[in-house]
């Protein structure tokens, strides 16, 4: 089991604590998704995220001045307040994965797009010698990421290396 300890520089006083939770699942060995059978020519399917999820907030805080007023400011481009866009709950993909399995789709690999964005997470599911080609123009990047990129003058590569850019889960299928 892997994991990390979240750091909140400049956000939390030394004497405060961050409370987090986790879940552990059980799967039959025959249903394990290992990525070992991914081959060139397989298809990658991106499943939408619900927003920023919980990654890249140090960069978010460097782009936006976070105050009660700024978080409560409504933006037409977002269709909501900045706070609502940034704090949208992280999507959990259990129901999505169950539906895909029940539809008979053979998932060969699965990559949760977290810290490290596309560039670090997608390769983790690929066997040696296999690489992914992501067609960035095949979906619409959500407005919160466009706003972050524009307001922060952030290069596209940095955006895809930090954020999920609207794709929270990538599946490799035959």
Can you describe what each PLM-predicted range is?
Residues 1-58:
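Glycine-rich anion-binding loops of enzyme active sites
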Residues 12-19, 70-71, 76-87, 91-174:
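Glycine-/charge-enriched secondary-structure boundary and capping motifs
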Residues 25-27, 42-44, 48-53, 61-64, ...:
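Glycine-rich beta-alpha junction loops
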Residues 38-84:
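Acidic, glycine-rich loop-and-beta core segments that form the ion-binding/anion-interacting portion
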